[in-house]
């Protein structure tokens, strides 16, 4: 766990992350499908809990940024300073409980959302260029969008839960918090991940 002091800040920026599968891996698309109900929109668990239920933030999301080596998983939000610890606990508990809470409804909602989204996904020139760039960078075949559709329709609940169990473990992730050290630094030790490592704004360790 890392902390960056932003003196007198009224908000805390929270980032949670880890490295996952390499870009170009056939498992990456499956992982992105499973992530959808964790942090892929308004109806996902992070947004629903932190914004709609608790009112701690305007937004909370998680996503995968495909990379040639290992693809980073990120979950993030900006919350009111006085609920920093409470928000961190929500991130931890939602991520750790995601595999067991994931159900058939989650999977079907995700499938319908992504299938419908594909109808409009490549209407813009920029989207087509991005698709070609992705194909070139990761060596995807011309049929990779079709292949993704087939994977999407075939993935089952047991496989989705197995993917979540393998990849979403907050106890093995990095937590980075930027906020007011004076009021929040001691509190967040209650999260159970030990004393935070202090960094400056450039990411250098402060002794």
Residue ranges and their predicted role:
Residues 17-23, 33-37, 72-82, 95-101, ...:
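Second-shell loop/turn segments in exported
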Residues 7-9, 19-21, 39-40, 63-65, ...:
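Solvent-exposed coil/turn segments that connect beta secondary-structure elements
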Residues 1-5, 157-165, 169-207:
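Proteolytic maturation boundary segments
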Residues 1-43, 206-207:
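His/Glu-based metal-binding/catalytic segments typifying zinc-dependent metallopeptidases
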Residues 16, 31-34, 50, 75, ...:
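Buried hydrophobic packing residues in well-ordered domains
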Residues 65-121, 189-193, 202-205:
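M16/insulysin-pitrilysin zinc metalloprotease superfamily fold
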Residues 1-11, 48-57, 68, 101, ...:
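Short acidic/His-enriched helical or mixed secondary-structure segments at domain edges of catalytic enzymes
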Residues 15-17, 38-79, 199:
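A structural supersecondary motif
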């Amino acid at each position: 766990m890392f902390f960056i002091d932003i003196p007198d800040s009224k908000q805390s920026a929270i980032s949670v992350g880890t490295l996952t599968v390499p870009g170009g891996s056939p498992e990456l698309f499956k992982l992105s499908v499973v992530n959808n109900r964790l942090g892929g929109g308004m109806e996902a668990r992070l947004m629903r809990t932190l914004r709609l239920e608790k009112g701690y933030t305007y937004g909370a999301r998680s996503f995968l940024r495909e990379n040639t080596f290992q693809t980073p998983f990120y979950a993030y939000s900006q919350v009111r300073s006085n609920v920093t610890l409470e928000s961190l606990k929500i991130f931890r508990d939602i991520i750790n409980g995601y595999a067991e809470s994931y159900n058939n409804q989650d999977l079907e909602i995700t499938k319908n959302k992504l299938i419908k989204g594909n109808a409009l996904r490549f209407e813009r020139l920029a989207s087509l260029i991005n698709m070609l760039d992705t194909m070139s960078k990761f060596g995807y075949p011309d049929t990779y969008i079709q292949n993704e559709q087939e994977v999407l329709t075939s993935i089952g609940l047991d496989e989705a839960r197995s993917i979540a169990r393998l990849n979403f473990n907050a106890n093995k992730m990095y937590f980075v918090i930027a906020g007011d050290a004076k009021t929040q630094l001691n509190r967040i030790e209650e999260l159970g991940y030990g004393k935070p490592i202090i960094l400056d704004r450039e990411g250098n360790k402060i002794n």
